[in-house]
């Protein structure tokens, strides 16, 4: 994919890898307060971004809809079946090595216990706690949408 980038007022054509992913914004009512919502976050345990936090999800496979990909990824990563709700937003983010398109969906748990099969750690965060972890840059872009 060819992307046009504007830098210092000049147009530069740059070949950049494009990765399209889906992210689950799994939410529930707080266990301590039935009036407050919590959002599930996971911590990476590998690679360049080890120890950074993200919303669970992953890459879409050929022929999958975003909803199908999200259900598959959460089952693979967390052994949990989810209901995929509305599309909250799509984040476009330029990492140094690639451009990321991340489709973010509100989700709820149908069954399963959110077992960490690929992640280092996980936390349920209230809206006030969202800034208490170090988010991957693209995921950090999503935080403003969750504070409303």
Locations of regions flagged by a protein language model:
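Conserved N-terminal beta-strand and adjoining loop/helix that marks the start
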Residues: 9, 14-39
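Active-site-adjacent beta-strand/loop module that shapes the phosphate/pyrophosphate-binding cleft
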Residues: 81, 90-113, 123
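Hydrophobic packing within well-folded, soluble alpha/beta domains
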Residues: 66-75, 87, 105, 122
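Conserved Nudix-box catalytic region and its N-terminal flanking loop in Nudix hydrolases
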Residues: 35-76
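Short secondary-structure junctions
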Residues: 77-84
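NUDIX/MutT-family hydrolases
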Residues: 106, 115-146
